């Protein structure tokens, strides 16, 4: 009986000395959108080049620019700029340097993609929500090549450039 009274007393004492803490609240997730795209394509330099398709943003695909030019002789240059626009609400940044691809034939041809001031596009370059940066694309038939380096037939070059963006 004493043991039973002792257990009941300890149980009541424990119950009297215990409590439950609760945390209650609400959180609202605001609407956000991701919208990094191209806008405002402008040809800036055409020297000795024939433009068969001016650079344009692909309809329905604002993350792609296409163009078609013929560089007619050594020293020919074609250059255009395009804005990279962050029309979303989330800050973005480049995740890597641009990847240039295609059969660029570097002995006779230069293909560069830089910021409009000529500085290289590097990883971790920020693009704030609502901001834009201008990219310059330049293709050039080198003028300081030898006769042996000249192509013996028209050569189509398929050029690509990818600039990866991620959330900052």
What are these regions (language model features)?
Residues 8-12, 16-21, 34-39, 66-115:
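Surface-exposed interaction patch
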Residues 1-2, 96, 123:
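Terminal low-complexity, poorly structured segments
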Residues 1-63, 153-157, 166-168:
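Short, polar/proline-rich extracytoplasmic segments that appear immediately after membrane translocation
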Residues 46-49, 60-61, 102-104, 115-119, ...:
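Intrinsic-disorder/low-complexity loop/linker signature
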Residues 66-70, 121-127:
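Beta-strand-rich interaction surfaces with strong enrichment in secreted/lumenal proteins
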Residues 29, 52, 64, 79, ...:
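Intrinsically disordered, low-complexity, compositionally biased regions/tails
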Residues 72-101, 129-168:
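C-terminal, structured domain-capping segment
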Residues 111-114, 119-121, 125, 133-138:
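Strand-loop-strand motifs at the edges of beta-sheets in extracellular beta-sandwich domains
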């Amino acid at each position: 009986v004493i043991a039973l009274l002792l257990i009941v007393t300890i149980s009541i004492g424990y119950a009297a000395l215990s409590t439950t803490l609760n945390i209650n609240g609400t959180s609202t997730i605001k609407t956000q959108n991701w919208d990094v795209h191209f806008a405002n394509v402008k040809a800036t330099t055409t020297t000795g080049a024939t433009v068969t398709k001016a650079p344009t943003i692909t309809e329905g695909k604002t993350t792609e620019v296409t163009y078609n030019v013929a560089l007619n002789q050594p020293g020919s240059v074609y250059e255009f700029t395009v804005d990279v626009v962050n029309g979303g609400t989330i800050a973005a940044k480049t995740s890597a340097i641009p990847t240039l691809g295609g059969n660029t034939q570097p002995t006779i041809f230069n293909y560069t993609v830089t910021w409009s001031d000529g500085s290289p596009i590097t990883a971790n370059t920020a693009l704030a929500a609502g901001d834009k940066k201008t990219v310059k694309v330049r293709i050039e038939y080198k003028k300081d090549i030898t006769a042996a380096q000249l192509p013996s037939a028209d050569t189509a070059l398929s050029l690509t450039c990818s600039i990866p963006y991620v959330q900052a």
